[in-house]
Amino acid sequence: AENRERVMVQ
């Protein structure tokens, strides 16, 4: 995945 850092913001 490329949005792994953003996925945690959920």
Curated annotation (Swiss-Prot):
Expressed by the venom gland. GO terms for cellular component: extracellular region. It is found in: Secreted. Keywords: Secreted. This is Peptide 9797.
